[in-house]
Swiss-Prot record:
Family named by the database record: Belongs to the bacterial ribosomal protein bS16 family.
Organism field: Wigglesworthia glossinidia brevipalpis
The keyword Ribosomal protein appears for this protein: yes
Lineage start: Bacteria, Pseudomonadati, Pseudomonadota, Gammaproteobacteria, Enterobacterales
HAMAP family (UniProt xref): Ribosomal_bS16
Protein name in the entry: Small ribosomal subunit protein bS16
Amino acid sequence: MVIIRLSRKGSKNKPFYQIVASDNRKPRDGKFIEKLGFFNPISIEKSKKIFIKTDRINLWMSKGAKLSDRVKNLLHKYKK
């Protein structure tokens, strides 16, 4: 099953996350199908903090992909 989740990047104590569509059997930071955006929790500017390709996420969800809890919360905040 395809799941849309966060993949951790960045260095120690400076996390940066990519929002990716991947198979749920793959490791968190492993191979993914498509990159759908990013989330930078450390950034102060809102424009550099989060970016989500909502059209692509909607496409994956229509094909049966599930959202992780954290991505679901981020998507809700991004739409506001």
